[in-house]
Amino acid sequence: MNDKLNYKLLNIPDQLGEEAIKTLSQEPEIKNTLEFIQKTDILVFGIGKAEEMAKRRRIPEDKVNEILSKGAVGEAFGHYFNEEGEIVYKLNTVGIDLETFKNIKESIAIFAGKRKVDALIAMTNINKNIVLVTDEENGYKILEELN
């Protein structure tokens, strides 16, 4: 399927040490995928609520509290950001980074859950060129928040 759609999927654990990242990044298949990411035109991604994503990623409770105390409302690509779209914490991850994300021609956010509206709005402060896929209820909630 990936040949027909010309896409790549990078399956690597979220949090790795510097040495592991360096080693993995040199593996031929991973290196090829990372190079592909730099040239991509279309990205489909999700946005998470900061606290939920930190817990899902098994970040220690004291670090979660630190991230939230810095005003984090959302997370994407291992970056935790506040309402203004400022990065308040970054995980050690392999894959897409925010600079690459900002330069992709078509970014498509798949979004569900009213509780994440503030995260989505904050993400638009990072990159305004986002196509949003959501349901009607969330669409109205976003419009309500923006007005």
Describe the predicted segments one by one.
Residues 1-147:
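Conserved phosphate- and dinucleotide-binding cores of soluble alpha/beta proteins
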